[in-house]
């Protein structure tokens, strides 16, 4: 997975109005949090309505579902209904084996794996995943840097 370009993803969308305003600005990807304990969590039904609207009006914007430590069968069953997300972003402790299994089950969906970076040594966690995922959103903790996406 060599770095090819930088993308802009706006995440934590909770309404159609937010999604459309952000889409109008020209973002590359819009993310919805599918993690129950998140304050920005929205239901699968509401997410599907937002993603359908985006798919119809802005088909080139990636639609990202952010999940955390979800069983693979739950992702397949609960998150990939019509209209399909274009990307699943893993934001938990998912290991390489998990990434391989998920990619095998849904080969046509992009797979991103997020990493929390607190120091330079944390960057070493990324390398082993490079051949098993499509992009790496990197969040810096305790730094004043924005989240970056390596694709």
Over which residues does each language-model region extend?
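A structural signal for short coil/turn segments at secondary-structure junctions
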Residues: 58, 82-83, 106, 130-133
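Active-site-adjacent beta->alpha loops and helix N-cap segments on the catalytic face
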Residues: 38-51, 92-106, 121-123, 143
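Catalytic cores of alpha/beta
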Residues: 17-24, 72-82, 121-131
């Amino acid at each position: 997975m060599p770095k090819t370009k930088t993308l802009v993803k706006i995440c934590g969308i909770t309404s159609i109005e937010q999604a459309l305003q952000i889409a109008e600005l020209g973002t590359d990807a819009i993310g919805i949090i599918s993690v129950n304990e998140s304050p920005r969590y929205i239901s699968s039904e509401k997410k599907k309505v937002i993603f359908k609207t985006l798919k119809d009006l802005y088909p080139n914007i990636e639609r990202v579902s952010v999940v955390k430590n979800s069983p693979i069968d739950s992702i397949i069953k609960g998150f990939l209904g019509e209209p399909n997300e274009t990307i699943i972003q893993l934001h938990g402790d998912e290991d390489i084996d998990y990434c391989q299994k998920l990619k095998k089950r849904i080969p046509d969906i992009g797979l991103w794996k997020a990493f929390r970076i607190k120091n330079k040594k944390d960057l070493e966690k990324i390398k082993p995943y490079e051949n098993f995922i499509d992009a790496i959103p990197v969040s810096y903790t305790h730094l004043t840097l924005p989240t970056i996406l390596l694709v």
